[in-house]
Amino acid sequence: MDEKGILVAISGGSCSGKTTVAEMIYQLLSKKLKVAIICQDNYYKSYKNKPLLKRKTINFDHPDAFDWKLLRSHIEDLLNGSIVNVPLYDYINYTRAKKTAKIGPIDVVILEGLMPWFDEKLSRLSKLKIFIETNGEERLIRRIERDWQRGRNIDSIIKQWREIVAPMYEIFVEKMKRNADLILPWSQRREVSTSVLDVAIEHLFHKTVEKNN
């Protein structure tokens, strides 16, 4: 595949700060290149044929919850210079929304989520893999604040954390560090300047384009 763009992947536990880092990089890069952020959550399987109560019990922190085939296809299309209609996730109804977001053509795709390079093909396509490391206590506090704003009650948030989120982090998400190019502790995010990442990603993009021309 002659890539016209590059993929940067950002992994980390729930509420570790992945989106924040992705947006910081976007703000710098988008001044020079066409950049898009894609959230891996948008590629949860639809589960639209299951009733809402059943959808609420699904383990969304397990790799099997994602539509890897669709995600791979869309990433490959974007790296090829095409336009894709990215699905959007409805956090209230635990399924895909009816609307989609049109993205492309782009130079840099930032894919952020729990395990964006769990899939071998996506791992190979990723030019830079960044893992955001944040302690569990901080992540839980952020999770409670976030899900409370989404209308969840405290008991259900903590129950889900204990039974699903924390165990899945240990089994799957934390292992993403093994193949990460950069492990970024949240507490040191300001020492590891995003401007450095900006320069590195821009260099990777131009290097990839030159190689394929």
UniProtKB/Swiss-Prot annotation:
It is an enzyme of class 2 (transferase). It is found in: Cytoplasm. GO terms for biological process: CTP salvage; UMP salvage. Keywords: ATP-binding, Cytoplasm, Kinase, Nucleotide-binding, Transferase. SUPFAM superfamilies: P-loop containing nucleoside triphosphate hydrolases. It catalyses: uridine + ATP = UMP + ADP + H(+); cytidine + ATP = CMP + ADP + H(+). Pfam families: PRK (PF00485). Its EC number is 2.7.1.48. ATP binds at G12, G13, S14, C15, S16, G17, K18, T19. Pathway: Pyrimidine metabolism; CTP biosynthesis via salvage pathway; CTP from cytidine: step 1/3; Pyrimidine metabolism; UMP biosynthesis via salvage pathway; UMP from uridine: step 1/1. GO terms for molecular function: ATP binding; cytidine kinase activity; uridine kinase activity. It comes from the Bacteria. One of its GO terms (cellular component) is cytoplasm. HAMAP family: Uridine_kinase. Belongs to the uridine kinase family. NCBIfam families: PRK05480.1, udk. This is Uridine kinase. It comes from Mycoplasma genitalium (strain ATCC 33530 / DSM 19775 / NCTC 10195 / G37).
